[in-house]
């Protein structure tokens, strides 16, 4: 906790003092790119990804220790009947991750990515946001700090994902609280909500934002009132990665909502981040546009679990490999343009 005694103060200070990109590393990467055996710009966005890696790691583009971090949390708002699945599925899926049986496990194997799963007090759901704040300031700050530990073991590319029954309701509430509009614009099917369940989901988002409306000018208050433990932990992980020069790939609708909290607190807070994919959740593209980002992939996915970010990590690894492994015109004896 900060010297002032207010739990969020340390995070506010970090958000005011974010490190910027490494200009020298970026210039060096651009210079090397101009010497590689290809026409300028021929690798399209792969080139920009390589430059992004250089700028935010401070060294030549490379991905040697990529990590997918999944944060799992449960939500009191599920008592409002906003999802067809019981909250017990969150813990069951955490066990599935540990056993290697989920989609994210297979994608991590395919792309040689590390995987860590963080169980965030699943037996103690957050407060029902239609009736009370999801978390106290102290609990929210502590969960952010816990999320910051995701990179403690060392990584040079962090993929952020989540698992939590009810958390697309949470994400919709955050987006409505931050950006306005209507609940209908931000609420989607999530794990398959339709009919009366979807109506209850929309109603819950409306009620939650109305209840907390006098406190939504502060992004950290949006997070603690409308969010959840996985939201706070993902925000902490993204922030820690920035401080430690670790580029980040953000996954789907829920992870994007966590990122939006940081962006609202500091417009430069996500400069070290890419959006891995746009999901089929209806509000996701709108949320990405609010962040000023362009997703790497659009595969019609809506699973969460870091799956889209992990797939995008394969592209980032390829971008780094091309930049570092291609021959220059001089090395290959190939004539450059005149």
Swiss-Prot record:
Pathway: Nucleoside biosynthesis; alpha-ribazole biosynthesis; alpha-ribazole from 5,6-dimethylbenzimidazole: step 1/2. Keywords: Cobalamin biosynthesis, Glycosyltransferase, Transferase. It is an enzyme of class 2 (transferase). It catalyses: 5,6-dimethylbenzimidazole + nicotinate beta-D-ribonucleotide = alpha-ribazole 5'-phosphate + nicotinate + H(+). The active site is at residue 305. InterPro entries: Nict_dMeBzImd_PRibTrfase (IPR003200), Nict_dMeBzImd_PRibTrfase_bact (IPR017846), Nict_dMeBzImd_PRibTrfase_N (IPR023195), Nict_dMeBzImd_PRibTrfase_sf (IPR036087). The keyword GTP-binding does not apply. One of its GO terms (biological process) is cobalamin biosynthetic process. GO terms for molecular function: nicotinate-nucleotide-dimethylbenzimidazole phosphoribosyltransferase activity. Its EC number is 2.4.2.21. Belongs to the CobT family. Catalyzes the synthesis of alpha-ribazole-5'-phosphate from nicotinate mononucleotide (NAMN) and 5,6-dimethylbenzimidazole (DMB). This is Nicotinate-nucleotide--dimethylbenzimidazole phosphoribosyltransferase. It comes from Sinorhizobium medicae (strain WSM419) (Ensifer medicae). The lineage of its organism: Bacteria, Pseudomonadati, Pseudomonadota, Alphaproteobacteria, Hyphomicrobiales.
């Amino acid at each position: 906790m900060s010297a002032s005694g207010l739990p969020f103060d340390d995070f506010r200070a970090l958000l005011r003092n974010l490190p910027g990109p490494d200009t020298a590393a970026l210039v060096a990467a651009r210079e090397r790119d101009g010497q590689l055996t290809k026409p300028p710009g021929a690798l399209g966005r792969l080139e920009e990804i390589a430059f992004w890696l250089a700028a935010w790691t401070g060294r030549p583009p490379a991905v040697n220790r990529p990590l997918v971090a999944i944060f799992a949390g449960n939500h009191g708002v599920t008592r409002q009947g906003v999802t067809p699945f019981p909250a017990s599925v969150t813990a069951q899926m955490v066990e599935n991750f540990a056993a290697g049986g989920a989609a994210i496990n297979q994608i991590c194997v395919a792309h040689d990515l590390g995987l860590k799963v963080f169980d965030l007090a699943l037996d103690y759901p957050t407060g029902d946001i239609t009736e009370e704040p999801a978390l106290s300031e102290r609990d929210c700050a502590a969960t952010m700090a816990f999320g910051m530990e995701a990179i403690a073991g060392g990584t040079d590319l962090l993929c952020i994902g989540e698992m939590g029954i009810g958390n697309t309701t949470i994400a919709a509430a955050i987006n409505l609280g931050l950006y306005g509009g209507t609940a209908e614009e931000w609420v989607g099917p999530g794990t398959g909500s339709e009919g009366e369940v979807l109506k209850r989901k929309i109603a819950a988002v409306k009620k939650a934002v109305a209840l907390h409306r006098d406190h939504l000018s502060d992004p950290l208050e949006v997070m603690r009132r409308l969010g959840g433990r996985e939201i706070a932990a993902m925000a902490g992980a993204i922030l820690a990665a920035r401080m430690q020069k670790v580029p980040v790939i953000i996954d789907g609708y829920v992870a994007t909502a966590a990122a939006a909290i940081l962006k609202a607190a500091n417009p430069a807070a996500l400069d070290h981040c890419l959006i891995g994919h746009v999901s089929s959740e209806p509000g996701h593209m709108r949320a990405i546009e609010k962040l000023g980002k362009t997703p790497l992939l659009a595969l019609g996915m809506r699973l969460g679990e870091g799956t889209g970010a992990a797939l995008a990590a394969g592209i980032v690894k390829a971008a780094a490999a091309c930049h570092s492994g291609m021959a220059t015109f001089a090395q290959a004896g190939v004539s450059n343009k005149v």
